[in-house]
Design a protein with these regions (language model features):
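Conserved, mostly hydrophobic/aromatic
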Residues: 9, 47, 55, 81, ...
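Conserved anion-binding
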Residues: 11, 15-26, 94-181
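N-terminal beta-alpha supersecondary unit
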Residues: 20-64
Length: 261
């Protein structure tokens, strides 16, 4: 069954929810949906108490290492961490309490070409069983292309079943943000979910556009329950008015809790 995987998105040392396609190097075009008064460790402890394992801490740019470590310390082994991961620092983040490290940009050169040697270096550093490959993507003609550098740069790698087959040998899970709909609360990229949901070889988590619990049910149906889901800006926990966090916890526990606000 499709599980709810919680998230802690960090930007400038604060827990935030941002519109996915607006995060640039200079920050001028940044659109923020929510900035929390609570620290990352508060969220990590909440997820721990509610038994929501497998969530992710994402560091969006510099100035987030300290708060990310605080979150991991609040739930050792309960959260994955991503953002700026390299073969050189990955083991350090595992030692800090991350269950897995999440990688994207370091797998590509400046031109957006996949560097299999870097992927193999990461496997050597922490093991495939500790690696989550973030294939967050944007729509291009004929499909989806993996996006790197805060989702601003399209790589040459297309998100296809063939790509997943090749990369599956080097990781434990995939994380897929549909960057075009991330943070907009306008519904999921159904075609992307359908394509990914037919693959089913490794655990996979989808994020992007979820605005009601029925979206999670749809992901469940399209993937045969093999794909998990992350909810961000729609969630009351992050200032949203569309989905109650308590309903997602209840759903996970097999109770009825499917009303939306």
């Amino acid at each position: 069954v499709t599980r709810f995987r919680p998230c802690i998105d960090l930007h400038g040392g604060r827990v935030k929810q941002i519109v996915g396609g607006t995060l640039t190097q200079d920050g001028v075009s940044l659109r923020t949906n929510f900035v929390s008064d609570r620290g990352a460790a508060w969220y990590a402890d909440l997820y721990r108490r509610d038994g929501l394992s497998g969530g992710h801490v994402i560091k969006l740019g510099p100035g987030n290492d300290h708060v990310a470590r605080e979150a991991l310390a609040a739930w050792p082994g309960g959260l994955q961490v991503g953002g700026g991961m390299t073969p050189e620092n990955a083991e350090e983040w595992i030692s800090s309490g991350a269950s897995h490290v999440i990688v994207t940009s370091c797998l590509f050169d400046a031109e957006g070409t996949l560097r299999m040697d870097r992927l193999k270096d990461l496997v050597s550093a922490v093991g495939a069983e500790r690696l989550v490959l973030d294939l967050s993507c944007r729509r291009v003609q004929g499909g989806w292309a993996v996006a790197m550098n805060r989702w601003q740069t399209l790589t040459e790698l297309r998100v296809t079943a063939e790509t997943l087959d090749v990369l599956a040998e080097y990781c434990a899970e995939f994380l897929i943000h549909a960057a075009d709909v991330e943070g907009l609360c306008t519904g999921i990229d159904r075609e992307l979910v359908e394509m990914l949901g037919n693959w089913r070889r490794l655990p996979m988590t989808y994020a992007g556009g979820i605005s009601r619990i029925q979206d999670i049910d749809e992901i469940d149906a399209l993937s045969g329950g093999t794909m998990d889901a992350t909810v961000g800006s729609a969630l009351d926990l992050f200032g949203g008015g569309l989905i109650r966090y308590g309903d997602l916890v209840a759903r996970q526990r097999g109770k009825s809790g499917t009303e939306t606000v």
